[in-house]
Amino acid sequence: MRHELERLEQADYKEKLQGKAKPQMIFFTAEWSEPCRQMQGLVEELADAHYAQADFYQVDLDEQPLIAGDFNIAGVPALVICREGKEEERIVGLRAYPDLEKVVVKYL
């Protein structure tokens, strides 16, 4: 079953990330980026495999530039791993699924 990534919006994203026991995986993307399109499916696979242990979100760089600014996103694709809305680690650039999963499982 495919678990869609919940889209974060400026109005309420901080509330969504606070007070959660599970780690949050935030995928920063842009429609115009081919590497982002390629990595989208990989992040969705991660969400399918680990939805019970982590919350998965998506932020479009062009639609939500303030959120991207809050996380100092300079390039996409980027996967930011947070706890309670605070960054623990980030992966920047297109990566293979095993490389992504290796980092993600450290926080589950």
Model-derived regions: residue spans:
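N-terminal leader/targeting and pre-domain segments
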Residues: 1-24
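Short pre-active-site segment immediately N-terminal to redox-active cysteine/selenocysteine motifs
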Residues: 21, 28-32, 75
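Conserved helix-turn-beta segment immediately C-terminal to the redox Cys motif
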Residues: 21-23, 40-59
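Structural microenvironment flanking redox-active thiols in thiol-disulfide oxidoreductases
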Residues: 61-67
